């Protein structure tokens, strides 16, 4: 890909009004942590001369889009994200856009600590080869930055999953799960200076490597 014509879209995680999505002790809120990391990654990429956009920076939808129905509000949020990415694809050509949605994982939704830990990357069940290449580049960057890696098999680095933002965006798209917000060790690392730097750095390095290879 041509660095000068590539649009990198970084996706933030969820909303403050989305139930759960935090560590059992409340130290980590996924929507807040994700936005902090995305902001840092975008700033680093821009400083290196890349074009970076963020799909949704606010912590909640505008009042006019909020709803008593959790499902309806979530669907509105996801639709807004997909529309943002696809409009950039329409304006710039889908081959010149890539999408990386930055999340935290969870083993349960019960407010308890769990044993599962580590980093993983997801692609759509109908992912293109470009999406798989992007996932592989991020996987390699996570591994080189010392993160414990989770993969479905020794031969495959990415997890196929039916996720709305991956299946409905027109460009190469992946979703990263950056450790578990319900694992004590992972939370401690996420909140450490070294952990924050590693999470941000792996995204910068992985995206740069993909643009170089694609």
Mark where each language-model region is:
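Catalytic-core regions of hydrolytic enzymes
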Residues: 2-119, 125-129
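Non-catalytic surface loops within mature trypsin-like serine protease
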Residues: 104, 125, 140, 180-182
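Solvent-exposed, polar/charged alpha-helical surfaces in well-ordered, non-transmembrane soluble domains
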Residues: 31-39, 43-47, 83, 132, ...
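Active-site-adjacent substrate-binding region
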Residues: 130-158
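Active-site-adjacent mobile loop/cap segments within catalytic or ligand-binding domains
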Residues: 6-9, 20-22, 108, 149-214
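Short, low-complexity, polar/charged sequence segments that are solvent-exposed and flexible
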Residues: 28-29, 119-126, 139-143, 193-197
């Amino acid at each position: 890909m041509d660095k000068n014509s590539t649009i990198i879209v970084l996706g933030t995680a969820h909303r403050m009004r989305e139930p759960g999505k935090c560590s059992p002790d409340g130290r980590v809120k996924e929507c807040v942590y994700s936005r902090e990391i995305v902001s840092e990654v975008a700033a680093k990429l821009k400083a290196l001369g890349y074009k970076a956009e963020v799909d949704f920076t606010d912590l909640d939808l505008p009042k006019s889009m909020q709803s008593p129905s959790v499902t309806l509000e979530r669907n509105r949020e996801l639709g807004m994200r997909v529309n943002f990415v696809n409009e950039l694809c329409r304006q710039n050509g889908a081959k010149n856009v890539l999408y990386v949605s930055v999340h935290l994982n969870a083993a349960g939704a019960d407010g308890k600590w769990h044993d599962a830990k580590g980093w993983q990357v997801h692609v759509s069940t109908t992912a293109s080869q470009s999406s798989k290449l992007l996932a592989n580049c991020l996987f390699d960057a996570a591994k080189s930055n010392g993160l414990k890696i989770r993969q479905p098999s020794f031969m495959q680095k990415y997890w196929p999953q039916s996720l709305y933002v991956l299946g409905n965006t027109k460009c190469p798209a992946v979703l990263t799960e950056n450790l578990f917000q319900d694992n004590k060790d992972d939370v401690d690392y996420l909140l450490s200076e070294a952990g924050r730097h590693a999470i941000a750095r792996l995204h910068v390095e992985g995206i740069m490597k993909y643009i170089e290879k694609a």
